[in-house]
């Protein structure tokens, strides 16, 4: 397990940038501080699956102003950091994606959640999320080293 690499999901990114989204913070203060550390040092590396940005634009692109803010204050800021990566959906991630089964009959994962979880599997690192379905799934299946919420 890599102790210095973390995959960040959409709800964690929204929590960190809660002032832009005018949203509640859903992750712990220690997870916020970990993300903040990556924005101010190169001690740790953050991985953002491309699905995070797709989900942001689908759910939060309400007008041109918020779209511009997402691009300039979030996307470019991450893109320009040496210790942050926007990860594409590659073959290994796809293979891990296909290994993920629905956790409960009445609670299916959406494609974004599965891609994000599969990215953490591929990178063999912890996931920063507050998504209870992903947390429960990993408790049952133990496919990634851990989840920080």
What spans do the regions from the language model cover?
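Short, well-structured N-terminal submotif of metal-dependent ribonuclease cores
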Residues: 1-48, 60-73
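Acidic, PIN/NYN-like endoribonuclease modules and their adjacent C-terminal/linker elements
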Residues: 1-5, 23, 38, 115-149
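Histidine- and aromatic-rich ligand-binding microenvironments
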Residues: 8-9, 48-49, 106-111, 131-132, ...
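A generic structural signal for short hydrophobic patches within well-formed alpha-helices
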Residues: 13, 53, 134-135
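Residue-level signal for well-ordered alpha-helical positions
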Residues: 19-20, 59-60, 100, 140-141
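Conserved beta-strand segments of alpha/beta enzyme cores
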Residues: 45, 83-85, 142-146
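Active-site neighborhoods of divalent-metal-dependent phosphate/nucleic-acid chemistry enzymes
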Residues: 83-133
């Amino acid at each position: 397990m890599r102790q210095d690499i973390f995959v960040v999901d959409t709800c964690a990114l929204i929590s960190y940038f809660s002032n832009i989204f005018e949203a509640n913070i859903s992750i712990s203060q220690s997870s916020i501080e970990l993300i903040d550390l990556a924005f101010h040092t190169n001690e740790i590396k953050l991985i953002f699956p491309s699905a995070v940005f797709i989900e942001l634009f689908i759910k939060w692109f309400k007008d041109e102003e918020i779209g511009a803010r997402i691009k300039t204050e979030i996307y470019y800021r991450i893109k320009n950091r040496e210790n942050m990566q926007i990860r594409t959906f590659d073959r290994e991630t796809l293979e891990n994606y296909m290994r993920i089964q629905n956790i409960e009959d009445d609670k299916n994962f959406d494609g974004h959640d599965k891609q994000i979880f599969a990215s953490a599997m591929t990178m063999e690192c912890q996931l920063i999320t507050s998504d209870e379905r992903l947390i429960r799934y990993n408790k049952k299946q133990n496919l990634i080293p851990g989840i920080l919420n």
